Curated annotation (Swiss-Prot):
Transmembrane segments: none annotated. Gene3D superfamilies: 2.30.30.30, 2.40.50.740, RNA-binding S4 domain. It comes from Methanospirillum hungatei JF-1 (strain ATCC 27890 / DSM 864 / NBRC 100397 / JF-1). This is Small ribosomal subunit protein eS4. One of its GO terms (biological process) is translation. GO terms for cellular component: cytosolic small ribosomal subunit.
Length: 241
């Protein structure tokens, strides 16, 4: 059972029934972290696009599921927050987000919204030629000549001929809008009030104001993903309050 795990111990973020079949597909190493949702689990358990692994493999062979502009080939490939999933045959598009219970949720979006994706910069490295490589939260990276900071979010084009070009930028700074993707405030959209560096190995703290309730709350910078500047880009990104 190297490629499977027991449903009862599957990540809660998957949001799947735990008392049906005994085993479920394990996510292969790749994009996102260990809580990434295998595409077959998304297609079968969440969306009902396929009924079993056999159907899932057929759909993938026919290149009928596209993630972030690329056809998915392996049923155990993981998808995660802010990924764009398209089904060309039906013309449907979705953005993967997290709700307030930390579960993956699938938000229908239109074709225009599906033409780009948002990613968080985790760190940067200098590569050959002096160019800057932005290392992104989902495990991918992109080269640039411009200056961006760790913690910022960038928007990458998924259009043919422009794929992975940076078309927008949301800085990690007070006054800008962020979505929380972990902890007890998961799914909340708020405005950053203050970023508090913490010495040593402890995570830095961030204080935000909940745009829905008006209340202030605190989280750690690892859970913060920028989603707008002075005004929230909530409608554009399909983020639910």
């Amino acid at each position: 059972m190297g490629h499977h795990l027991k449903r009862v111990v599957s990540p809660k973020s998957w949001g799947i029934p735990r008392k049906t079949d005994k085993f479920v597909t394990k996510t292969s190493p790749g994009p996102h972290n260990k809580n990434a949702l295998p595409i077959v689990v998304w297609a079968r358990d969440q969306m009902g696009i396929v009924r079993n692994m056999k159907e899932a493999k057929h759909v993938l062979r026919e290149r009928e599921i596209i993630v972030n502009g690329r056809p998915v080939r392996h049923p155990d490939m993981g998808i995660g927050i802010f990924d764009i999933v398209s089904i060309p045959k039906s013309g449907k598009h979705y953005r993967i987000l997290r709700d307030k219970k930390g579960r993956h949720v699938t938000i229908p979006i239109d074709e225009d919204a599906a033409s780009s994706r948002l990613v968080k910069i985790t760190n940067k490295t200098i590569v050959k030629g002096g160019r800057i490589q932005l290392n992104l939260r989902d495990g991918s990276n992109v080269l640039t000549d411009k200056q961006y900071k760790s913690g910022d979010s960038i928007v990458l084009s998924l259009k043919e001929g422009q794929k992975n070009e940076i078309i927008d930028h949301f800085p990690f700074q007070p006054g800008n809008m962020a979505m929380i993707i972990g902890g007890k405030h998961s799914g909340v959209v708020g405005r950053i009030i203050e970023h508090i560096p913490v010495p040593g190995s402890l995570p830095n703290r961030v204080i935000l104001k909940d745009e829905s309730s008006g209340e202030s709350f605190e989280t750690i910078d690892e859970y913060v993903v920028m989603v707008g500047r002075e005004s929230p880009a909530i409608d554009r990104w399909g983020i639910e309050e």
